[in-house]
A protein has these predicted regions:
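Compact, glycine-rich, soluble single-domain proteins
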Residues: 1-81
């Protein structure tokens, strides 16, 4: 079985669906993201971007979550479409 091609969440485009694969960073950061529903196996899509492009809003677990690109770069995803 081959490893999936992973991208950072910051690279996800509006028309793409993805599954969260792994999260890097400190324990505190991982805990904070997990408390917001950012966990391995969750489906995530881009909802919209701010006028300057950062932060971006994502659809996850039936709600919209805003994340800075600085945080999104620590979240690795596998494209689903």
């Amino acid at each position: 079985m081959s490893k999936p091609d992973l991208l950072s969440l910051a690279d996800l485009k509006k028309s793409q669906d993805a599954m969260i694969h792994k999260i890097d960073g400190s324990h505190a950061m991982k805990s904070r993201l997990a408390s917001m529903g950012i966990i391995s196996g969750s489906k995530i899509t881009v909802d919209h971007s701010s006028p300057m492009g950062d932060p971006r809003a994502y659809n996850i677990l039936d709600y919209v979550l805003s994340l800075r690109d600085e945080d999104a770069k620590n979240i690795f995803i596998e494209l689903r479409n």
